Swiss-Prot record:
The N-terminus interacts with KaiC, while the C-terminal histidine kinase domain autophosphorylates and is probably responsible for self-oligomerization. The N-terminal domain stimulates the C-terminus to autophosphorylate. This is Adaptive-response sensory kinase SasA. Its EC number is 2.7.13.3. It catalyses: ATP + protein L-histidine = ADP + protein N-phospho-L-histidine. Homooligomerizes. Interacts with KaiC. Participates in the KaiBC complex, whose core is composed of a KaiC homohexamer and 6 KaiB. Keywords: ATP-binding, Biological rhythms, Kinase, Nucleotide-binding, Phosphoprotein, Transferase, Two-component regulatory system. It comes from Prochlorococcus marinus (strain MIT 9303). The modification Phosphohistidine is found at residue 155. Member of the two-component regulatory system SasA/RpaA involved in genome-wide circadian gene expression. One of several clock output pathways. Participates in the Kai clock protein complex, the main circadian regulator in cyanobacteria, via its interaction with KaiC. KaiC enhances the autophosphorylation activity of SasA, which then transfers its phosphate group to RpaA to activate it. In addition to its output function, recruits fold-shifted KaiB (KaiB(fs)) to KaiC to cooperatively form the KaiB(6):KaiC(6) complex (independent of SasA kinase activity).
Length: 370
């Protein structure tokens, strides 16, 4: 009997296309553990590939969004993508097992009927319909991912443009000399050029895969961000207090993206602080794994029921006064950037008592991140 069962087992060849940081997703970890340890009725072969190392796979399998799981064998090929890859796989494994019954043990059954009520042709049509539905869901996920990527990169362009405009205004008012002005504008134009290259990569690369984490001094990045926004706080007599320990460890992060997060949070804090108010920026070595950053203001605060929504895509809270425009897409971009780095971002606030935004950034580990 064991020999019969062994002959009935069919090879299931799967390919998981995912970047290294995506493999930390809980659903992907659960799926990999399931395929390695559970008996799903197949002899499973799971291959994994990083799209940054094998970009040809994106074109070969027509992938726009990753992670993606591809069933290579038995045919026909199927692609699973989106946020429910493991669930999709579990649903289809049952149907693949039914196919084995039809093509294997089913040889002794009546070919016209499988369950006594539906013909084999009806079941085949149902299978084809399910495949079409799954492909449609995958296509929608791809389009949504591409739209989200375009929105993220387009918003990133705003940061260097804002810095260049502020530098121009400061130079016209005589607040900075021409050499400083030229240096700021050149650096921001270089950044815009890099972002334009990112836009060209959107068709074949996820926004998250454009990140380039490195050994980074986060204190220096914060100091540069404060200087770039100096016109916003000097003109309004706002005090900025910093608390950055001299022994703060280096972090492992993308310099451009982390600078963008700090600029966005500082700009929001300045925008919601009244003239003559205060904004604080603090950093501390929370654990051996993380540096925690906090940016606080003494503005109008954020209602508790809105503190989760402000980090969602396409959510903009109503303006709090005639001079402020409300929190917008910048916070959703900040959340995505922080989460790609493996950290988290949150806000603590009470109405009329200001707001403190917190985020965590991974500490650079000499042995594992060189």
């Amino acid at each position: 009997m064991d020999g019969v069962k062994a002959n009935q087992r069919q090879q299931l060849q799967l390919l998981l296309v995912a970047a290294r940081h995506q493999l930390s997703r809980s659903d992907l970890r659960s799926m990999i553990q399931f395929l390695e340890n559970e008996d799903c009725g197949f002899d499973v072969t799971l291959q994994m590939a990083d799209p940054s190392e094998q970009p040809e796979l994106l074109e070969l399998h027509r992938l726009v969004a990753t992670p993606a799981l591809i069933k290579l064998s038995p045919t026909p090929k199927q692609v699973f993508a989106g946020s429910s890859i493991f669930q999709q796989l579990q649903n289809w494994i049952t149907r693949w097992q039914q196919d084995i019954v039809v093509t294997g043990l089913g040889l002794s059954l009546r070919p016209t009927e499988l369950d006594g009520s539906r013909t084999q042709r009806e079941l085949q049509l149902e299978d084809q319909l399910l495949v079409l539905r799954q492909e449609n869901e995958t296509l929608i996920d791809r389009l949504n991912a591409q739209e989200r990527t375009l929105r993220m990169v387009a918003h990133e362009l705003r940061t260097p443009l804002t810095a260049a405009v502020l530098a121009l205004q400061s130079q016209q008012l005589g607040q900075i000399n021409i050499e400083h002005f030229q240096d700021v504008v050149k650096r921001r134009l270089d950044e815009i050029e890099l972002l334009s290259k990112d836009l060209l990569e959107v068709k074949s690369t996820r926004w998250e895969d454009l990140f380039n984490p490195q050994n980074l001094d986060l204190g220096n990045i914060a100091a540069e961000a404060i200087l770039e926004l100096e016109k916003l706080w000097l003109d309004r007599n706002i005090e900025i207090h910093t608390d950055i320990p001299s022994d703060l460890p280096k972090v492992f992060a993308d310099q451009r993206r982390m600078r963008q997060v700090l600029l966005n949070l500082l700009e929001n804090a300045l925008k919601f602080t009244e003239d003559g108010g205060q904004v604080s920026l603090s950093m501390l070595h929370r654990t051996s794994q993380w540096v925690q950053v906090s940016i606080c203001d003494n503005g109008p605060g954020i209602p508790e029921d809105e503190q989760e929504r402000i980090f969602l895509d396409r959510v903009r809270l109503p303006q709090t006064s005639v001079t402020t425009s409300g929190f917008g897409v910048g916070l959703s971009v900040c959340r995505r950037i922080v989460e790609v780095h493996g950290g988290k971002i949150w806000v603590v606030s009470e109405p009329d008592k200001g707001a403190c935004f917190y985020l965590t950034v991974p500490v650079w580990q000499r042995n594992g991140q060189e």
